Amino acid sequence: MAAGRLSPTRRRTLGRMTEPDSPAPVPDAQLPGGALMRLVRPDDAPALLAAYRRNAAHLAPTEPRRGERFLTLEGQAERIAGQLREWEAGRAVPWVLDGSHVPGAPPVLGTLTFTGIVRGPLLSASVGYWVDGEHTGRGLAGQALAQAVAYARDALGLHRLEAGTLLDNTASQRVLLRAGFTWYGTAPDYLHIAGAWRDHHRYQLILGEVEPRP
């Protein structure tokens, strides 16, 4: 992900790709604070379970309500398997923010995920992320998002990324704006979050003038 930018010609060629026969490689990326941004693995299930349990109160205001199985080892294993199937199909990229080599940090510091990767004339994906409540405000989300933006542009050949936030989630809005995203509207009752339908601000980042597949 830290590779140099592709030439405009190469980006146009990527934009004409159909659904890929195999997923684009996802190299590890060392973030400035010491965390490692990498593709999720099946053996991450215990650490992800611990992370979600540890951050239950932190994430509750910004996430949909989860079933009881979500906070079980089996539930996390099933979720990872589903994410990797989506990655293999070219429809998603699920990263974890690995804190194994950060002094005093837990094994999982958060996640960042591309979902809904669409090619053809749209060439777009949605991005979502969260960071451990004890490690917010340290630039980790912004560092991870910068790596993800470069990957979307240079490896996936996408034209656009989109994201949404609750109206009062100013911290996430700042992360998006610093990464170059722009606000383009507010969607009423956009997602069912914390037990109710919630309005969301919508943001997008145009990655380049990519020519879609004919």
Q: Which residues does each PLM region occupy?
A:
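Acyl-donor (CoA/ACP) binding surface of acyl/acetyltransferases
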Residues: 2-47, 51-61, 96-214
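A short helix-loop-beta-strand connector motif used in the catalytic cores of GNAT acetyltransferases and
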Residues: 67-70, 81-96
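Conserved GNAT-fold acetyl-CoA-binding loop/helix
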Residues: 58-81
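Generic, well-ordered alpha-helical segments
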Residues: 40, 51, 68-76, 89
